[in-house]
Amino acid sequence: MKTQQSYQQRDDKGTLYLVATPIGNLEDVTFRAIRTLKEADQIAAEDTRQTKKLLNHFDIATKLVSYHEHNKETMGKRLIDDLIEGRTIALVSDAGMPAISDPGYELVVSAIKEGIAVIPIPGANAAVTALIASGLPTESFQFIGFLPRQKKQRRQALEETKPTKATLIFYESPHRLKDTLDDMLLILGNRHVSICRELTKTYEEFLRGTLEEAVHWAREATIKGEFCLIVEGNGEKVEPEEVWWESLSPVQHVEHYIALGFRSKEAIKQVATDRGVPKRDIYNIYHQE
């Protein structure tokens, strides 16, 4: 086991600070974060243009360097060398906690291997912020982050989360939201969901309902902003009065999904999931008529 005494005097190596930044509202930054950013020898940022806005707002003149997915190997080595030489580096992401859904994780691992102190400066986090306002269970949750861009890989990832009883937390971009909601309904079934948009910003919005309702909303809405999706875990079914397909025959049920853009095979699978019956039964009923 390696031991780190975070605030013990260290004269040899520097310190890597993981500094949380606001997820939208600049008033959410902490006094400690501002002090750390001012006192660091340099700030490593995912997008220097975005971080520069924050630094200018709080009159922070610390040297700013770029550290992102495409330069993480070369820049990561340079940052580690600086830390070994005794410099202090503050790592930030575009918004929220660094090392969450960004390459900061690799830098943390490298720093720990070199015996460099890694100190978190906590603050805003979109996932937890969305979760506590979702109305879904908070005692157990699993953070998934961004799903794969490709449909096949995205559906496979959702299949892997399907048995999870904990509340699920996803991030999604506006141009992929519709496809993601379609796949969630197909794979996970008609669970409760909270769609959180533009957290802490002027146009912050929460849409709470079922995945079926979310799919309908997304097909009609103009999708803008960054999204956090909080999805009910497996095992907590929608209340009986909310079973929207109860009045439909199996054939009408399949045709409903086809009208939403599902292929017949996908529609049959989803109907079987909704009704809790074998897929073969729905297939036979649908093709007999």
UniProtKB/Swiss-Prot annotation:
This is Ribosomal RNA small subunit methyltransferase I. Catalyzes the 2'-O-methylation of the ribose of cytidine 1402 (C1402) in 16S rRNA. The lineage of its organism: Bacteria, Bacillati, Bacillota, Bacilli, Bacillales. The keyword Amino-acid biosynthesis does not apply. The gene is rsmI. Keywords: Cytoplasm, Methyltransferase, rRNA processing, S-adenosyl-L-methionine, Transferase. It is found in: Cytoplasm. GO terms for molecular function: rRNA (cytosine-2'-O-)-methyltransferase activity. It is an enzyme of class 2 (transferase). It comes from the Bacteria. One of its GO terms (cellular component) is cytoplasm. Its EC number is 2.1.1.198. It catalyses: cytidine(1402) in 16S rRNA + S-adenosyl-L-methionine = 2'-O-methylcytidine(1402) in 16S rRNA + S-adenosyl-L-homocysteine + H(+). Disulfide bonds: none annotated. Belongs to the methyltransferase superfamily. RsmI family. It comes from Halalkalibacterium halodurans (strain ATCC BAA-125 / DSM 18197 / FERM 7344 / JCM 9153 / C-125). The keyword Transferase applies.
